[in-house]
Amino acid sequence: MEELGRVRLSDPDALLPAGFWAAVTVWLERPQVANKRLCGARMEARGRTLRSHAQAECGPRQGQGHGLEREPGQASPKGEPESGPRASREGTAPAADLNSLWDRVSQSLVHANPEMLAFLCGPSLGPQPEAAQELDLILRTVIPKASPHSPLTEPKKELVVQDVSSGSVTFLPLEEDNEGNLEVKTSNVYQLHLHHNEGEWFISVLIFCPERWHSDGVVYPKPAWLGEELLSKLARWAVENRKSEFKSTLSLVSILRYSRMYQELKEKYRDMVKVWPEVTDPEKFVYEDVAIATYLLILWEEERAEKGVTTKQSFVDLGCGNGLLVHILSNEGHPGRGIDIRRRKIWDMYGPQTQLEEGSITPSDETLFPGVDWLIGNHSDELTPWIPVIAARSSYTCRFFVLPCCFFDFVGRYQRQQSRKTQYREYLDFVLEVGLSCGFHVQEDCLRIPSTKRVCLIGKSRTYPPSAEVWMDEQRTRYLHSRQGHPQSRPGGAHAPSAPQTAAHDAGLQDSCRTVNAGSECVLEGLAAERGAGAPAPGLWVPGFCPREKAERVRNCAALPRDFVDQVVLQVANLLLDRKKFNTGNSEARSLKPWNGGGSLSLAEVAAELNSETLQRLKRECGGLQTLLKNSHQVFEVLNGRVHIRDWRQELQRGKPPEAKQNLSAAVFKTRICWFFAHHPDGCVLPAAQCPFAHGPEELRLSQTLKKQRQAP
C-alpha cells in the first residue's frame, strides 16, 4: 500500500464530513468533471451490507435483513450524499447480480487476499450508530470518450465500496475471467480516505499495489494524476459551500450511447468547419450543433423504443439560424424543416434535402404545426417562451425542446424580480412555468456543449387527457392574459396595475412579477393596445409581439458614434492615469524621461465611475464596457478582468506580435492618429519612426481600402 498524496482541508463552514461524501459523489457519478478523457459513468446497481459481516465473513448473512438490493430511493447514512437520479434511471444490473458479485468478491478476498480485505475495510473512526456500520456498494461503468486516437478503450466496470464509519471509499476495477464472470483486477485498486486528527481534516489517496499499477491514460490514469489532480479537486469540492442549481449533465439519456454517437457525428460533419462561410466561430457552432443533434437523436431513439414504433419523428426548428441542426437531423433520417427570419450564406451549401425557409413567426392561429411531432427552439430568442404554447396548440401529440439563451417574455425583454436566484435560473423557471401552464410534464437536463447556457427544457407528455383539450386551452388563454397584466415599465416610471395570475403553476415555483423593457418598440405597441388602441388582430394570441429584425443589428460596439467612444476612452484613460505609475524603459533608442503608465482598475471599478446614461448605452451592446475597451486596443489592455494602459515598449519586446498589432500590416501602417501622441500628458512612449500610428496629420497615410474606393469608376 502506498499513499500517493495527502492534503489538509480548511473547513470554516463546518461542511465536513458531509462535504467529503458530496465530493466523492461527483467523482463517482460525474468523473468527467475531473478526468476530461471520460464521457461519464453509469450507475448499474446499488446495495448495502453490514460492515461487521464484511469483516467477519465478507458477505451478507442470509435472513438478517442486511442483504444487497437495488435501492435508488433509500436514505443514505448521515453525512453521505443521496444517490442521484441517474443511478435509478440507468441502473440495469438486477439486485441478485450485485449480491452474487459481492459474495464472490468477498469470499475471494478472505481466502486469497486478506491484505486487500484489511485495506478495504480499514479501522473504524470510533463508535458509530448501526446505520453507519454499513457498507454501501455501487456497481458502475466508467465510459471513456469515444475518440479516433484511442479506439480500443472500452467502458470499464468498477465495484465501489463506501465505508462511512472509516471515512473511506475504495474502487475495485473488475474484469471478466475465462468463464465470463467478473473478478477484481487487483493491480488497479485505489482508495480515497478522510482523516480527522487533532481537530484537523485530511483527504488522502492510496493505492493498494503501486508496483503493479497499469495506466491506460484514460479510465486508469497515472498514479501521479490521482495524487495531485484528483486529490486537489476533491479537496476543493469537499469544502465548497454551494449547491448546483441545475441537473447533472445528460441525465435523461444514455451516456454510453451519447459518447459513441457524438464521435460518429463529429467525424461525419467535421468538414463543415473547413467551409464555414459565416463570421461566427466555426468550431464552436459546428460542434455545438453536433452535440445538440446527438442529444435529440438519442432522445427520439429512446422515445421510439418506449412507444414501440419505428417511424422517425418529424420536427420544425423555429429560429433555426445557420440551419446546421436541421441539416444534421434531416441527414439522419428525420423529416423536418427550419424557419428563420434571416437567410444565412451557409444555407446554399446544404443541398435540397435540407429544407430551410426564410420567414417570420408571429404566434397566432396561422402559425400552428398540427402534423409535426417536435418543435425545436435552439437559442430561439423572442420565440422561446412561445414554443411550448405553439406546441400545445398545434396538436395533443406535439412535443417541444427548447434551449433558452437570451431572456425574452411573451412581449419584449424579460426582466428579473427574484434576487435570490440567478437571472438564468429565474428565466429557466419562467419557461418551465409556461410549459406547466400549457399542460406539459416538463423535464430539465444539461447538455454537453461549449456554452454557459446549456440547460434544455423538454415537454414530452401532457398532464391532462385529450378529452380535456378545450378546457386546457382556456387555461392557456387565461395564462397569456395574466402575463400581460404583469407590471410593465411606462415612460416616466409609472407601472400598470398587475392582474392576478389564474393559471395553475408548479408548487415549487415562486410567483413573481416580471417587467418588460420600456425601450422596446414591441412594448410600446403592447401598451397602446392595453390603453384601448386596439385588440389583437384576428387569430393573434396577444397584442404587441414583434419578431426580431430581418437585418441583424451590429452590437459589438462598432456601430456606436465615434464621439461617444472617444469620450469613454478618454474618461477611462484619465482614471487610469490618475493612478500614476512612472517608468522609464531600458532602451537607448528611447527617451529616458519618466512616462506615466497609469495604474489598473477592475471593470467593476471603471463602471462605477461612468454615469448611468453611458452604462445603459453600453448595456445594449454585446459585451458592453469590456467590448468597447478591448476594441480600443491601441490604448487599453484588458487582462483577467482588469484594465491597464497599453505600454507599446513592452509590446515591441514580445516575441510574437501583440494582440493590438496583429492587424497592423503594411496596409494600415500610419493610417490612424496615435492616441498617446494626441492625448497622453507625456506623449507617445515610442519615437515616431517606431510607432505604428501617425504622430500628427503629416504622417497620415490613406488606407488601401479608401484608395480602392476612390479609384473605382
Swiss-Prot record:
Molecular function in Gene Ontology: tRNA(Ser) (uridine(44)-2'-O-)-methyltransferase activity; zinc ion binding
SUPFAM superfamilies: S-adenosyl-L-methionine-dependent methyltransferases
Entry keyword Methyltransferase: yes
Phosphoserine PTM positions: S76, S489
Keywords on record: Cytoplasm, Metal-binding, Methyltransferase, Phosphoprotein, S-adenosyl-L-methionine, Transferase, tRNA processing, Zinc, Zinc-finger
Pfam families the record matches: AdoMet_MTase
Gene Ontology cellular-component annotations: cytoplasm
Protein family membership: Belongs to the TRM44 family.
Biological role stated in the UniProt entry: Probable adenosyl-L-methionine (AdoMet)-dependent tRNA (uracil-O(2)-)-methyltransferase.
Protein name from the UniProt record: Probable tRNA (uracil-O(2)-)-methyltransferase
Organism: Mus musculus (Mouse)
Gene: Trmt44
